[in-house]
Regions:
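Preference for long, well-ordered alpha-helical segments
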Residues: 147-167
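Iron-sulfur (Fe-S) cluster-binding segments and ferredoxin-like electron-carrier domains
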Residues: 42-44, 81-99
Length: 167
């Protein structure tokens, strides 16, 4: 929705200004996503707070990026795919092969069986709007994940979807 106003500190609604000022102070710039989310101060707060929670969940940073890349790719947000690919690459969170597999939505091409199961489960969550089959859930658990992490995948998909749709 890039047709919406991309706010600056000067143009942001009063309720969004403290958050947008903090982003500017911490990053030295205001990403377009933040500027657009400032149109709805509650959406900006949601993004920032859920983002903190998502980053602190029990999935590894690499696993979080698998969820984010797959969600962005599924939602056809090239900007988000590129951003999460760059983050995963720069921080060495995933192998080159795993990044390639996530970007291609090719769960079977991961070089790590557990990440492959995560990718398959994330794709199922998105395709079935959370109503995964018993077999899909069992495969996720059999790969070493647990109920908490199943819900964390859904949280990651929700966060990614907000970003993907706003971008």
């Amino acid at each position: 929705m890039s047709r919406l106003t991309i706010h600056t500190v000067e143009t942001a609604p009063e309720a969004a200004k403290p958050r947008i000022e903090a982003v500017l102070k911490n990053n030295g710039f205001i990403p377009n996503l933040i500027g657009v989310l400032a149109n709805a101060p509650e959406a900006l707060a949601f993004y920032q707070e859920v983002g903190k929670l998502n980053a602190a969940n029990s999935l590894t940073d690499g696993e979080v990026e698998v969820v984010q890349i797959i969600a962005a790719r599924t939602n056809e947000c090239g900007f988000c795919v590129a951003g999460h690919t760059k983050l995963a690459t720069l921080k060495k969170l995933l192998s080159e092969q795993s990044i390639k597999a996530a970007r291609a939505l090719a769960a079977g091409e991961f070089d790590d069986a557990k990440l492959s199961a995560l990718a398959t489960f994330t794709q199922a969550v998105m395709a079935k709007k959370g109503a995964v089959s018993d077999d899909e859930l069992k495969a996720f658990f059999d790969a070493g994940y647990n109920q908490q992490q199943a819900v964390e995948v859904v949280m990651g998909v929700a966060l990614a979807t907000l970003c993907n749709y706003v971008n």
